[in-house]
Amino acid sequence: MKSKHLALLLPLLFLVGCSDPEQRPVVQQVKPPARAQGVDLPTDAGRVAQYIKGSGLDFVARYYRKPDSRWPALSANEARVLSALGLNVVAVWESHSHKRDYFTYGRGYWDAVAAARQAKGVGQPGGSAIYFAVDFDATVADMYPIDQYFRGVTAGLAASNGGSPEYKVGVYGSGAVCDAVKRAGLAQYAWLSNSTGWAGRSFAGWNIRQGRPYAHLGFINHDSNEARDDYGGFRLAGM
């Protein structure tokens, strides 16, 4: 009987022993993941890829473009060089994105078709993102045409892959544009422009933010960027 009573008392004694106010649970401090650092540039990054990697950067943003652009589009060879070095590639479509009157449903559709064609030619894997640029300080009056443009983008990406989009959609632009397009469910990723005077600069829902002074590279024509979480970048398969 005594042993039975002792057995019943043991859990209580254990609880009393652990109730010492000086014995506080140890909380392990988990270090948040470091943000990725990268650059975007309008020219072939393959020629400076080693330098970019050696500078401690994580990703390079490069452009898909129309054939008549004076700037070179991202190529398959360039993507291979970057991927082989362990650099992620961020793809962005840019055409006449600085013009207010450019944004229509039809242009969004055909831009997406062209971007998807180039992405497949490069070998960009499905499930990664293509960002589409809105490169001016859009007002409230501009939001409806921009909305229609991104609805066209969604339809164009779907049409390019048998009715089901192969690539996710990102939006590049002011905080106001990023917020509006994401709220409408028309983009999964947002890339906040470095133009500090544009509307919505305090937008906090970005995946990439342009203009952070992390990259100090010895060549011109590039912008520094930081990224967090999943930002839609990719490497070619097998690299």
Predicted regions located by residue number:
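Bacterial N-terminal signal peptides that target proteins for export
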Residues: 1-6
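C-terminal motif of bacterial Sec signal peptides marking the signal peptidase cleavage site
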Residues: 15-17
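Bacterial signal peptide processing site
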Residues: 19-21
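Functionally critical loop-and-helix segments that line ligand-binding/catalytic clefts
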Residues: 29-45, 49-52, 178-239
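Substrate-binding cleft of extracellular glycoside hydrolase catalytic domains
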Residues: 31-44, 62-142, 149
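Hydrophobic faces of well-ordered beta-strands that scaffold small-molecule active sites
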Residues: 35-39, 59-62, 89-92, 128-130, ...
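Long, well-ordered alpha-helical scaffolding segments within enzyme catalytic domains
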Residues: 113, 142-164
